[in-house]
Structure formats: structure tokens, C-alpha cells
Amino acid sequence: MENTLYFKDTIHCDQNNYPKKIYKVEYSKMLIEILDSDHIQGRPFYFSSPHSRDDFIKQIKDHILRINYEELEQIQHYWKKNIK
């Protein structure tokens, strides 16, 4: 089982269809790191329990798509190039 999963936001994208947010979820932690062009390496969003974290994911599950680490790096590179 993978310890870290990455999900891109499919609703909020820029004009080139790149996501404006990526969610980094680590299996054993009660936080989700939210990556965006202002926080390329991520900023933590804490939960009171793994259950509340999983509930958050269930709420947004229709608007996210799982990506692999290579796609994450590609998106981060795009954000770095296009920061204004």
C-alpha cells in the first residue's frame, strides 16, 4: 500500500488546464498538504482525526483525480515557470 497519495483538483484549473490545487494525503497523518502556485511545496491542513480527514476527502471526491509523483513534479514545474 502506498503511504502518500496525490490528487489534483479537476474543477479549478487555469487557462492551460493545469490544476490550481493538489492535495497530498499521507496514510498515517491527520493532515492534508495543499499545494498551489503560492505554496508549491505545500501547506498543511490539519484534522482532528484520520476519520475527519477521510470525511473531507469524501466531500471533494467528485472533484479530484489521483495523480502520480511524476505528474506532480510536472505541475510544480509549470507553477514555478508561470508565477507572476
Residue ranges, per PLM feature:
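Residue-level detector of alpha-helical secondary structure
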Residues: 53, 57, 61, 65, ...
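Acidic, low-complexity, intrinsically disordered interaction modules
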Residues: 13-62
